[in-house]
């Protein structure tokens, strides 16, 4: 199993409901279907949603939707866990999406994020210009953005540490990893706190 997939699975706690924003081919929906009563996968690609639908079959606990990633029809405080894996860097209105995620997550719910590490790309001298990567931030900037959106950072670490295969180094020297994994906790609304 790919290291990043295993790492994300290790951090996902059990809960009642999970939403996977930018679910792609549904790898995490498939892997996590036994841990949740309800799973929702959303992606902008109809092909990805169709493929995921074939993978999960007629499981009535799984809802797949093709649509934009910044407005959802779900009630407030509905989900226990949100996955946003390799998705936030593609979103034009990041602030609106994070506000919407905050709205649909219960207080104390976890959002697990993976994003490319722009700092590593600069340091390594490899300019990977991807026109679909709209948001290219350093790990510190990602954490500030999430905090501003009402999340508390529980954990951040590197994934795919390029030089040494040390898990300890990946946790401590996160700015050198090719990808950053962040676990953030949804804080209560300020007016309700």
Predicted regions and their residues:
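A short His-aromatic
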Residues: 86-90
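A short glycine-rich, Lys/Arg-flanked "PGG" loop and its adjoining helix->strand segment in the class I
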Residues: 95-107
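Conserved N-terminal segment of class I S-adenosyl-L-methionine
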Residues: 1-75, 81-85, 98, 135-140, ...
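Substrate-binding/catalytic lobe of Class I Rossmann-like enzymes that use SAM or dcSAM, i.e.
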Residues: 148-152
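Short, glycine-/aromatic-enriched active-site segment of Class I SAM-dependent methyltransferases
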Residues: 114-134
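Short N-terminal helix/helix-N-cap motif within the alpha/beta-hydrolase-1
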Residues: 47, 92-96, 123
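Short glycine-centered segments of the SAM/dcSAM-binding site in methyltransferase folds
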Residues: 17, 109-110
């Amino acid at each position: 199993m790919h290291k990043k997939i295993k790492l994300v699975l290790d951090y996902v706690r059990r809960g009642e409901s999970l939403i996977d924003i930018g679910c792609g081919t549904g790898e995490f929906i498939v892997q996590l279907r036994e841990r949740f009563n309800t799973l929702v996968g959303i992606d902008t690609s109809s092909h990805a949603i169709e493929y995921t639908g074939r993978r999960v079959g007629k499981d009535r606990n799984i809802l797949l939707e093709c649509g934009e990633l910044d407005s959802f029809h779900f009630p407030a405080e509905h989900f226990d866990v949100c996955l946003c894996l390799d998705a936030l860097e593609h979103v034009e209105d990041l602030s609106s999406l994070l506000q919407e995620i905050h709205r649909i997550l219960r207080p104390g719910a976890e959002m697990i994020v993976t994003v490319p590490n722009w700092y590593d790309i600069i340091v390594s001298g490899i300019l990977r210009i991807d026109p679909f990567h709209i948001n290219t931030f350093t790990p510190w900037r990602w954490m500030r953005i999430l905090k501003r959106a009402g999340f508390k950072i529980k954990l951040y670490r590197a994934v795919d540490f390029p030089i040494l295969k040390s898990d300890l180094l990946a946790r401590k020297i996160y700015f050198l990893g090719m990808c950053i994994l962040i676990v953030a906790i949804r804080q209560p609304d300020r007016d309700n706190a």
